[in-house]
């Protein structure tokens, strides 16, 4: 699964916090509509819902 796949199934109200694997500082935070193009095709290692509209994503 890639960030693009998450974008297809997300809604406009969801906020994504994206981390590189092993990093403690996020590389992106916001709606996937504004995700940088260099991240959109990256493979997702895992993701989890922090609450109804906030999703934490870890990239490979």
Question: Where do the protein language model's features map onto the residues?
Answer:
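N-terminal acidic leader/helix
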Residues: 1-24
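Detector for the mature cores of small, proteolytically processed
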Residues: 20-60
């Amino acid at each position: 699964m890639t960030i693009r796949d998450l974008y297809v199934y997300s809604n406009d109200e969801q906020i994504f916090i994206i981390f590189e694997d092993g990093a403690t500082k996020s590389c992106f935070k916001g709606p996937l509509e504004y995700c940088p193009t260099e991240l959109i095709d990256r493979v997702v290692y895992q993701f989890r819902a922090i609450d109804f509209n906030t999703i934490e994503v870890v990239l490979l």
